[in-house]
Regions:
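Solvent-exposed, acidic/flexible segments
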Residues: 49-57, 76-84, 103-111, 141-145, ...
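N-terminal secretory targeting signals
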Residues: 1-58, 178-191
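Short, functionally critical alpha-helical segments immediately adjacent to catalytic or ligand/cofactor-binding
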Residues: 54-71, 114, 148-155
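Catalytic and substrate-binding regions of cell-wall glycan-acting enzymes that process beta-1,4-linked
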Residues: 137-191
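Substrate-binding/active-site groove segments that recognize
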Residues: 77-97, 118, 152
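Short, solvent-exposed loop/turn elements at domain surfaces
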Residues: 70-75, 92-94, 161
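A short, structure-level motif marking secondary-structure boundaries and short turns
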Residues: 44-46, 72-74, 133-134
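Alpha-helical segment that forms one wall of the substrate-binding/catalytic cleft
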Residues: 96-145, 153-160
Length: 191
C-alpha cells in the first residue's frame, strides 16, 4: 500500500468510491474506500544502493545455525561434531585425519571440511542439479543449494533415492532431507 501511495501525483475519486491515481498518463484503479479525506502528495523516491551480499557465507551461516547454533565446539548425542555437525565417517571419507579435539578447536578445519563436502556432493549430484533445478518435485522447488543442504543432512545417496524413487530420508532427530531442500533452497552459491 505505501509504495502505491508514494507514487501518486494527483488523485480523484469516482462515484463508486474507487480512488483513481494519474501518474505520467497512466491511470491506476485502487480499490480503497474511505480515502476521500486524505490529502495525498507525491513523494520523490529515494534510491539506496544495496551492497552485494555473499550468498555462500549466508548459506553456510544458515546451515551452521540450524546444525549447531553456529558453535564450533559442540558435539551432539549422536557424536556429530562442530558447527556443521560432521560425523567421523564423513571426515574420514574426505581425507581428514584429525582428533575430535583438533576438529572442535579449529574453525579453519571445519570451514575447509564443509567446503570440501559441498564440492564432493556437487560433483556426485551434478546430474540431478542439472535435471531438476527450477522444477517442482513432490511439492518442493528444487535448487542447487537445497540439494547440497539435503546431501549434507542425509548423504548424497539419500538425495539420489529421493529423486529416483521419491524415498524420504530423516536423520536421528526426525529432520527430513526435503525440509533441508526447502529451508536452504534459493541461495546463489558458488562451490
Amino acid at each position: 500500500l505505501l509504495s502505491v501511495f508514494a507514487m501518486i501525483a494527483s488523485t480523484s475519486f469516482t462515484d463508486n468510491n474507487m480512488m483513481m491515481a494519474k501518474e505520467k498518463e497512466e491511470i491506476v484503479e485502487l480499490p480503497f474506500k474511505g480515502l476521500e479525506k486524505l490529502n495525498l502528495t507525491y513523494i520523490e523516491p529515494v534510491l539506496v544502493e544495496i551492497p552485494e551480499v555473499d550468498q555462500n557465507q549466508m548459506f553456510l551461516d544458515a546451515i551452521g545455525f540450524k546444525e549447531s547454533g553456529n558453535r564450533y565446539d559442540i558435539v551432539n548425542k549422536f557424536g556429530y561434531m562442530g558447527r556443521y555437525q560432521f560425523g567421523r565417517g564423513t571426515l574420514k571419507g574426505l581425507g581428514y585425519k584429525v582428533t575430535q579435539e583438533e576438529f572442535l578447536t579449529s574453525p579453519e578445519i571445519q570451514e575447509r571440511a564443509m567446503m570440501d563436502l559441498l564440492r564432493h556432493n556437487k560433483k556426485k549430484l551434478q546430474k540431478y542439479i542439472d535435471q531438476y533445478e527450477g522444477e517442482v518435485v513432490h511439492g518442493i522447488l528444487i535448487t542447487e543449494s537445497g540439494i547440497l543442504a539435503a546431501a549434507h543432512l542425509g548423504g548424497q545417496g539419500n538425495v539420489k533415492k529421493f529423486f529416483r524413487r521419491g524415498k524420504e530420508f530423516k536423520d536421528g532427530f526426525g529432520t527430513s532431507i526435503t525440509s533441508y531442500m526447502e529451508m536452504f533452497g534459493g541461495y546463489r552459491i558458488e562451490i
